[in-house]
UniProtKB/Swiss-Prot annotation:
Family: Belongs to the natriuretic peptide family.
Protein name: Natriuretic peptide AsNP-a
Source organism per UniProt: Austrelaps superbus
A Gene Ontology cellular-component term: extracellular region
Keywords for this protein: Disulfide bond, Hypotensive agent, Secreted, Toxin, Vasoactive, Vasodilator
GO BP: any one term: regulation of blood pressure
Upper lineage: Eukaryota, Metazoa, Chordata, Craniata, Vertebrata
Length: 39
């Protein structure tokens, strides 16, 4: 069960970065990389 949480955090960032790119930070919500957002 713990593994799922870790994968979700990493997958959310990787998957969103591939689809949205800079919106990945905002889409995930609490991702440790709000720099690519450009805000």
């Amino acid at each position: 069960s713990g593994s799922k949480t870790a994968k979700i955090g990493d997958g959310c960032f990787g998957v969103r970065i591939d689809r949205i790119g800079s919106t990945s930070g905002m889409g995930c919500g609490s991702v440790p990389k709000p720099t690519p957002g450009g805000s």
